[in-house]
Swiss-Prot record:
GO terms, molecular function: ribosome binding
Domain notes: The PRC barrel domain binds ribosomal protein uS19.
Organism for this UniProt entry: Lactobacillus delbrueckii subsp. bulgaricus (strain ATCC 11842 / DSM 20081 / BCRC 10696 / JCM 1002 / NBRC 13953 / NCIMB 11778 / NCTC 12712 / WDCM 00102 / Lb 14)
GO biological process: ribosomal small subunit biogenesis; rRNA processing
Subunit organization: Binds ribosomal protein uS19.
Record-given protein name: Ribosome maturation factor RimM
GO cellular component: cytoplasm; ribosome
Family of this protein: Belongs to the RimM family.
Subcellular location: Cytoplasm
Record has Chaperone as a keyword: yes
Sorted UniProt keywords: Chaperone, Cytoplasm, Ribosome biogenesis, rRNA processing
Length: 167
């Protein structure tokens, strides 16, 4: 079974086993909803979310199996994982980062290969995609309809229209 990272435990919060989680998921409301099944660390120990709530740029999460600060303290630095089968389907036009990374980026008009999608960041309203060309030079593209014209996950191709000054 494949597992994917959804966050990392960075600290404890309170005395009853609640932990502070730095997110690596775009869907914290789903991932940290009461009753959700997640896995901890390399040994993929299964845990059940008892409660989850936003807290500043983090989430505070309580697992049913972790009931005090001593147990929670041992989890600092632990990755939180979700199994592939628990991820669920995404709506059309929404993709997991792992599906996009490594895609060839093509000019929509000419079909010419511009580079490869090598990184994705989410600094604000829109994601930005790092594209690295064959010479190793990279530049960023905003993930907006005016730039990204189509995504074909099966072919691992993204077609874009480069606006003036993006490259």
């Amino acid at each position: 079974m494949n597992y994917y990272n959804v966050g990392k435990i960075i600290a404890t919060h309170g005395l009853k086993g609640e932990v502070k989680v730095a997110l690596t998921t775009d869907f914290p409301e789903d991932r940290f909803r009461a009753g959700s099944r997640l896995y901890l660390g390399d040994d993929s120990r299964e845990v059940t979310v008892a409660a989850g709530r936003p807290f500043k740029q983090f989430w505070l999460v309580t697992f049913a199996e972790i009931t005090d600060i001593d147990q929670a303290e041992k989890l600092k630095g632990t990755e939180i994982l979700i199994s592939e089968e628990d991820q669920g389907e995404l709506p059309d036009g929404v993709y997991y980062y792992r599906e996009l990374l490594g895609c060839k980026v093509l000019d929509d008009e000419s079909g010419e290969e511009i580079g490869e999608l090598t990184d994705i960041e989410a600094p604000g309203a829109n994601d930005i995609w790092e594209v690295t060309d064959k010479n190793g030079k990279s530049f960023w593209l905003p993930y907006i309809p005016q730039v990204v014209k189509s995504v074909d996950i099966d072919k691992k191709e993204v077609r874009v229209e480069l606006m003036e000054g993006l490259r």
